[in-house]
């Protein structure tokens, strides 16, 4: 694979991880502030 392809895959992976973390935080309500706002 070329370096460009590796960089693109790495960026996509990081974006996917960040997006999944936000979704988990909203669903499981790990943040106290979000829990209070949810109530």
Swiss-Prot record:
GO molecular function: toxin activity
Cited function: Probable neurotoxin.
Main localisation: secreted
Signal sequence bounds: 1-20
Keyword Transmembrane helix: no
Protein name: Contryphan-Cal3
Tissue: Expressed by the venom duct.
Key words of the record: Disulfide bond, Neurotoxin, Secreted, Signal, Toxin
A GO term from the CC aspect: extracellular region
Keyword Secreted listed: yes
Cysteine pairs bridged by disulfides in the record: 29-35
Domain notes: The cysteine framework is C-C.
Domain of life according to the entry: Eukaryota
Location within or outside the cell: Secreted
Transmembrane portions of the chain: none
């Amino acid at each position: 694979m070329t370096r460009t392809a590796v960089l693109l895959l790495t960026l996509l992976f990081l974006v996917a991880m960040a997006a999944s973390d936000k979704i988990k935080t909203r669903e499981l309500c790990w943040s106290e502030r979000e829990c209070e706002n949810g109530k």
